[in-house]
Amino acid sequence: MTDLTATPAPAEPAASAYDPTAKQKAQAKTARIPIKIVPIEKLKKPEWIRVKAATGSSRFNEIKTILREHNLHTVCEEASCPNIGECFGKGTATFMIMGDKCTRRCPFCDVGHGRPDPLDADEPKNLARTIAALKLKYVVITSVDRDDLRDGGAGHFVECIREVREQSPATRIEILTPDFRGRLDRALAILNAAPPDVMNHNLETVPRLYKEARPGSDYAHSLKLLKDFKALHPDVATKSGLMVGLGETTDEILQVMRDLRAHDVDMLTIGQYLQPSEHHLPVREYVHPDTFKMYEEEAYKMGFTHAAVGAMVRSSYHADLQAHGAGVV
C-alpha cells in the first residue's frame, strides 16, 4: 500500500551571519549600501569597446608569480581592470598596498569590502624588492581606503616610497591615494616626509552622482586634497581621473574639468565606466569616441599638461607615458 503521508520539507538553512572580517565582493558588498541599485536593460557594447584578453604569456605569468611570492596585490586584479592582459604582458602593474579589503563600498568598484587586516610591516620591503626584480622604471602605488587608521594609511605610503627609492633610486613613483577624509591635515603632513613624483587622487564622477556612486566621499573634500597637496609641493605634478557613462552630462564633465584646473591639477584621465557585475551600477551610456576627443581638446585648452582620454583609459593605464607627456619623466 502506498504511503501518502507527506514528507516534511527540509528546513531552510539559517541565513549566514554577517562577518565584517570577510572580503565581500559583488552582491555581498553592494547589498548593504543605502542606495539601491536598480537594474536597467543592459546596453550592447559598441565596436569601439575592445578589451585585450588576459593571456598566458611568459611575462604575464612571471608578474603573477612574483606578486604571489611577495604577498602583494594589484588593483589590476582586485578591480578587474579590463587592461590587465596588456599591462601584465608588458611588465607593468599598479600595486595595491594595505591589503585587499576596502572600508568603503563604492558600487562602481570591484575591490572587495570588509574589515581590513592589520598592516603588513614587511609590505614596503616586499614591494621594493618586487619592483627591483621587475626592473620597473615607473610604478603606480595605490591602496584601499583605510578609514580604520588614524592617518588613513599615509605613513604606510611613505614607508613604501622610501623603500622603493632605496632599492630603485631611478624609478619614478606615482601614488593614487584615497581621500584621507577626516584626517587630511595629518596625512598631508606625513606625506611631506617623502612626496611622490606624481600625486594622483581620482574624483571619479560628477558631484551630482556622488551619493550614488561614491558613498562616504565628498567632492569638495577631494578637490581640497589635491589643491592642498599642490600648495605644499608645487613642483610635484597632480593628477585626477573621471569615469563617464554613469548618467552624467557633457556639461557636468566639463565643469569638473574646470574645477580641477581651478584647484591646480595638472594631469587628467577620462575613461568609459564598465560594469564589473550585474550587482554594480549599470552603464547608462557608452560615450562616443568623438565626445572623448572633444574632452581631450578642451582639457588642453584649459591648461592641463597632459590628458589621457578614451574609452579604455584608466587612471594608471600607461601612466609612464602620461607622466612622460607631462614632462615628469
Swiss-Prot record:
Cellular component annotations (GO), alphabetically ordered: cytoplasm
Location of the Radical SAM core domain: 87-305
Binding site residues for [4Fe-4S] cluster 2: 102, 106, 109
The protein's required cofactors: [4Fe-4S] cluster
The protein's Enzyme Commission number: 2.8.1.8
Keywords assigned: 4Fe-4S, Cytoplasm, Iron, Iron-sulfur, Metal-binding, S-adenosyl-L-methionine, Transferase
Organism domain of life: Bacteria
Entry's cofactor comment: Binds 2 [4Fe-4S] clusters per subunit. One cluster is coordinated with 3 cysteines and an exchangeable S-adenosyl-L-methionine.
Residues bound to [4Fe-4S] cluster 1: 76, 81, 87, 316
Pathway(s) annotated for this protein in UniProt: Protein modification; protein lipoylation via endogenous pathway; protein N(6)-(lipoyl)lysine from octanoyl-[acyl-carrier-protein]: step 2/2
Name the UniProt record assigns to this protein: Lipoyl synthase
Species the sequence originates in: Burkholderia pseudomallei (strain K96243)
